[in-house]
Regions:
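ADP-ribose/nucleotidyl-moiety interaction motifs
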Residues: 1-185
Length: 185
């Protein structure tokens, strides 16, 4: 469906001085099929009550234009991550002010930093490992979430959430390439 009205409401609520210029939908059908298969055939069987915890979340692409990031064969790829409080991964926010206000949104050249773009992606986050406010050398070195169930089978958490701004951190497979580029002034 059309996400523009929802995005506009989220931007207006969290960034009252910003104005949504446009929402540009980008869909890679192959990556979307992979995402839907992961969500419907794999993740659904390991989540409590089958809840894959699917959400629309914002992602900043920093110095790289959103179009360039989405042109990659794997879509959002955690291997391009510079790391963060919870290691290398795709950092996703419920609130667009987190990537816009930080150094995460892509600043459009020639606009003096007043025009930015970021992504809004559909992500199936599955079972989250809640980190609270815990940040340490150990959390920064994380390569994957911790073990959730010793099993058998042994199950890991599917994503991590924590820190002062409460982003979600995922490993990549759960991010569908049903993304939209959000242009904000």
């Amino acid at each position: 469906g059309n996400v523009a009205p929802r995005v506009e409401a989220l931007v207006a609520r969290s960034c009252p001085s910003a104005r949504l210029r446009r929402v540009q939908r980008v869909q890679n059908k192959m990556l979307w099929r992979e995402y839907a298969h992961y969500r419907d055939e794999s993740l659904v069987h390991t989540c409590a009550g089958g809840d894959v915890n699917e959400m629309l979340l914002f992602h900043g692409t920093a110095e790289r234009a959103a179009e360039d990031v989405l042109a990659h064969q794997n879509g959002l790829d955690p291997r391009f991550s510079n790391g963060g409080f919870y290691g290398q991964g795709i950092y996703l926010a419920e609130d667009p002010s987190y990537p816009i206000g930080g150094r995460y949104a892509h600043r459009i050249s020639g606009s003096g930093g007043s025009r930015v773009q970021l992504l809004i992606v559909k992500a199936a986050l599955g079972s989250q490992q809640e980190m609270g406010q815990r940040i340490s050398a150990e959390t920064r070195a994380m390569r994957m979430p911790d073990v959730r169930v010793e099993g058998p089978p042994r199950l890991l958490y599917d994503s991590v959430r924590g820190g002062p701004h409460r982003p979600f951190v995922s490993g990549g497979g759960e991010n569908g390439c049903n993304a939209s580029i959000v242009h904000v002034v």
